[in-house]
Amino acid sequence: MDCLCIVTTKKYRYQDEDTPPLEHSPAHLPNQANSPPVIVNTDTLEAPGYELQVNGTEGEMEYEEITLERGNSGLGFSIAGGTDNPHIGDDPSIFITKIIPGGAAAQDGRLRVNDSILFVNEVDVREVTHSAAVEALKEAGSIVRLYVMRRKPPAEKVMEIKLIKGPKGLGFSIAGGVGNQHIPGDNSIYVTKIIEGGAAHKDGRLQIGDKILAVNSVGLEDVMHEDAVAALKNTYDVVYLKVAKPSNAYLSDSYAPPDITTSYSQHLDNEISHSSYLGTDYPTAMTPTSPRRYSPVAKDLLGEEDIPREPRRIVIHRGSTGLGFNIVGGEDGEGIFISFILAGGPADLSGELRKGDQILSVNGVDLRNASHEQAAIALKNAGQTVTIIAQYKPEEYSRFEAKIHDLREQLMNSSLGSGTASLRSNPKRGFYIRALFDYDKTKDCGFLSQALSFRFGDVLHVIDASDEEWWQARRVHSDSETDDIGFIPSKRRVERREWSRLKAKDWGSSSGSQGREDSVLSYETVTQMEVHYARPIIILGPTKDRANDDLLSEFPDKFGSCVPHTTRPKREYEIDGRDYHFVSSREKMEKDIQAHKFIEAGQYNSHLYGTSVQSVREVAEQGKHCILDVSANAVRRLQAAHLHPIAIFIRPRSLENVLEINKRITEEQARKAFDRATKLEQEFTECFSAIVEGDSFEEIYHKVKRVIEDLSGPYIWVPARERL
């Protein structure tokens, strides 16, 4: 086992006597010096060199005092910004970036995304570091007074629209209302969909994003969602809508509504139209409120109560990977079900299909009683644009899960009965590997017509490895082996071609390329095991901090952080076991580090800080994924401790991609981040469970959640002792 060394990256890995540690979560931040006390009265905030009117307006800004009572899950919002990491341009302000549904802020209803926090109780947080702002919020007690500043709502153009109901009703969908906010902090009723051919579509004036103020004489400001639906339904043929049009300023990137599908629980619109809108015998599904440009949340992270059970119509455009899902079923009329969604594939990107969906029809072909072969043919011959009628039936699908489990048990028992050394006794047949690179057969000049393309992290069952150039293999997913069978390049072929490429690249260089062959990655042998804990999560690469924070704040029941250890003395307000595990002596902690009881440790101000294996295990055994901000070295240490993490590498495609994902960093910062990521990939690729890329943080975050969903278990693939 390699020894632990002191490293210099952020959070609880410190460089001695340099910068203070930014610790692993808001619950474990060191006390920092705050600005001088600020005298606050009911009319104004008074601070040196700064004066503003509370609950009034000044210029283009307005100010509000909001009092929140801390709930079981905290205050219920996320922040970004600070002097050390500005959120918008060079502005050091502390901004609200997310309102957590059901939390204290959401229940109060006044705090909004993009609000800037000026004071927390009497603590000035206008020009402080991010960690100081978090500390101020943490130490604010159970009753927290926030003084916030926000842009004045842009002037809205109000107009009256007269609609005459047609065969498709009024022809639009709505979202919002008290207790069901479409935009956090805003109880308004918004138009979220215009149905083609409906009255609103033909009239042309009502648009997505419009706010409905009144229907005939019934006001819709600050009403329940159900009341708005009732008001629209209880109208005669002629309907007068009072509508507020958003200004262009509101549509700008900096102050647009947040990505509600990644930050908030999905709510469902109510379509103001007849159920025959889709032109099918199946009833119309309710439509998600989220704009199509936003990525959907992985289904189990939302909760099944948010998933409609009615049949719904989905249109998918076939991509280079096909439709991007696998099916099971088709025996004795049991139905065809989706068993796997390929991350990044067409089905995944559409966000409208999920594991457990029964496919009722494809392009009008009824599959309710189809065999597996008939369904596969229907999907294969469906063309580029495929219309699917699907219905979510998790209970029926669970029968397949049980069947798969029984088959797996039979195979395991059979394997135990015949011996377990199959790979050693016959290394050229019947073993499982994980791909450590992407393979596109069309880019291999010597590829076979029956070759099988695959992605990094795919598990493959090698059926026949007798040929030195090509192995016959079948793709494997967590729940079953697929019908995807073909030839993959052998380990020897991959390494020889990569060696040739590197040799040509380094031709003529002084360093040469001696020894490179050993570093070429192809495949690693894996074995399947069952786990009874929530796998720890290690995210690496650019935007990892934001992804970690969002997972913790958005899904506090599914993700958690562990309590670190330290040798420094306990402060008055700290509690042992909550803020830190306070170690009695440096010698004891050093011995534990040498005994490999820590996955990572470092020193700051002559005190040791570290994350122990036991702390991670405690979170994992509580059923929560432990979010770890550690280096890639920790992956192997966790594996050695039989706590197999999900390690996700966020790979930037280019320097421009880094700048696009994080618009508030400079080009120099982006270049350093890109270089660090490149080096990280070169050194630790084999440690990654998955590699994700994206053009925006929202796309990356969605893929991260999908990876966690797919790799959570209980059956997982882990490195095997046998080597190829």
UniProtKB/Swiss-Prot annotation:
The modification Phosphoserine is found at S73, S142, S295, S415, S418, S422, S425, S449, S480, S606, S654. Postsynaptic scaffolding protein that plays a critical role in synaptogenesis and synaptic plasticity by providing a platform for the postsynaptic clustering of crucial synaptic proteins. Interacts with the cytoplasmic tail of NMDA receptor subunits and shaker-type potassium channels. Required for synaptic plasticity associated with NMDA receptor signaling. Overexpression or depletion of DLG4 changes the ratio of excitatory to inhibitory synapses in hippocampal neurons. May reduce the amplitude of ASIC3 acid-evoked currents by retaining the channel intracellularly. SMART domains: GuKc, MAGUK_N_PEST, PDZ, SH3. The gene is DLG4. The modification Phosphotyrosine is found at Y240, Y580, Y715. Palmitoylated. Palmitoylation is required for targeting to postsynaptic density, plasma membrane and synapses. Palmitoylation by ZDHHC2 occurs when the synaptic activity decreases and induces DLG4 synaptic clustering. Palmitoylation by ZDHHC15 regulates trafficking to the postsynaptic density and function in synaptogenesis. Palmitoylation may play a role in glutamate receptor GRIA1 synapse clustering. Depalmitoylated by ABHD17A and ABHD17B and to a lesser extent by ABHD17C, ABHD12, ABHD13, LYPLA1 and LYPLA2. Brain. The keyword Phosphoprotein applies. Its main location: membrane. This is Disks large homolog 4. Signal peptide: none annotated. InterPro entries: DLG1-4_PDZ_assoc, DLG1-like, DLG1_PEST_dom, GK/Ca_channel_bsu, Guanylate_kin-like_dom, Guanylate_kinase_CS, P-loop_NTPase, PDZ. The PDZ domain 3 mediates interaction with ADR1B. Residues 428-498 form the SH3 domain. It holds the Pfam family Guanylate_kin. The lineage of its organism: Eukaryota, Metazoa, Chordata, Craniata, Vertebrata. The modification Phosphothreonine is found at T420. A lipid is attached at C3, C5 (S-palmitoyl cysteine). Residues 15-35 are annotated as: Disordered. Belongs to the MAGUK family. One of its GO terms (cellular component) is synaptic membrane. It is found in: Cell membrane; Postsynaptic density; Synapse; Cytoplasm. Residues 534-709 form the Guanylate kinase-like domain. GO terms for molecular function: acetylcholine receptor binding; beta-1 adrenergic receptor binding; D1 dopamine receptor binding; ionotropic glutamate receptor binding; kinase binding; neuroligin family protein binding; P2Y1 nucleotide receptor binding; PDZ domain binding. Residues 65-151, 160-246, 313-393 form the PDZ domain. It is linked to Intellectual developmental disorder, autosomal dominant 62: An autosomal dominant form of intellectual disability, a disorder characterized by significantly below average general intellectual functioning associated with impairments in adaptive behavior and manifested during the developmental period. MRD62 is characterized by mild to moderately impaired intellectual development.
